[in-house]
């Protein structure tokens, strides 16, 4: 298996798609990488020569923030917002949606599973 930024990319897929398995590389960055290194996006990973793989690896390592570095940067950004007390930091701290989504209904991913709250008791029959 070919490795890029410490991630094994699948051999059977097209290079353009296989590169998206690396955290921080989506379709657009994948296409830009292949254009810069002169590799055909439709080539399968198993058909890449060693020189092409090395060129892709070097381009990604030198020009794109990926995997651990990117994760650390995102976590640092969130921590900074929480510390300086911005609205977004407050939303992160409370575990609510950060980007203005509604919370009256939905937002279950951020809020977690529903917790039952005792409603109004019905008067019992005597």
Swiss-Prot record:
Q: What are the top taxonomic ranks of the organism?
A: Bacteria, Bacillati, Actinomycetota, Actinomycetes, Kitasatosporales
> What GO terms fall under cellular component here?
cytosol; small ribosomal subunit
* Keywords tagged on the record: Ribonucleoprotein, Ribosomal protein, RNA-binding, rRNA-binding, tRNA-binding
Q: Where is this region: Disordered?
A: 91-126
Presence of keyword Ribonucleoprotein: yes
Bias type Basic residues, positions: 108-126
Q: Name one Pfam family in it.
A: Ribosomal_S13
One GO biological process term is: translation
Role this protein plays: Located at the top of the head of the 30S subunit, it contacts several helices of the 16S rRNA. In the 70S ribosome it contacts the 23S rRNA (bridge B1a) and protein L5 of the 50S subunit (bridge B1b), connecting the 2 subunits; these bridges are implicated in subunit movement. Contacts the tRNAs in the A and P-sites.
Subunit and interaction comment? Part of the 30S ribosomal subunit. Forms a loose heterodimer with protein S19. Forms two bridges to the 50S subunit in the 70S ribosome.
Q: Which family does it belong to?
A: Belongs to the universal ribosomal protein uS13 family.
**What is the name of this protein?**
Small ribosomal subunit protein uS13
Q: Which InterPro entries match?
A: Rbsml_uS13_C, Ribosomal_uS13, Ribosomal_uS13-like_H2TH, Ribosomal_uS13_bac-type, Ribosomal_uS13_CS
Question: Which GO-annotated molecular functions does the record name?
Answer: rRNA binding; structural constituent of ribosome; tRNA binding
Q: Which domain of life is it from?
A: Bacteria
Q: Which organism is it from?
A: Streptomyces coelicolor (strain ATCC BAA-471 / A3(2) / M145)
């Amino acid at each position: 298996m070919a490795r890029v930024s410490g991630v094994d990319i699948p051999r059977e897929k097209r290079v353009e798609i296989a590169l998206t398995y690396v955290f921080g590389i989506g379709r657009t960055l994948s296409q830009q990488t292949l254009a810069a290194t002169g590799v055909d996006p439709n080539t399968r990973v198993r058909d890449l020569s060693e020189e092409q793989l090395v060129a892709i690896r070097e381009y990604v390592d030198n020009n794109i923030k990926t995997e651990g570095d990117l994760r650390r940067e995102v976590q640092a950004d969130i921590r900074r917002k929480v510390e300086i007390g911005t609205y977004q930091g407050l939303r992160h701290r409370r575990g609510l949606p950060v980007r203005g989504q509604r919370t009256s209904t939905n937002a279950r991913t951020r809020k977690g599973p529903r917790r039952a709250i005792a409603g109004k008791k019905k008067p019992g029959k005597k």
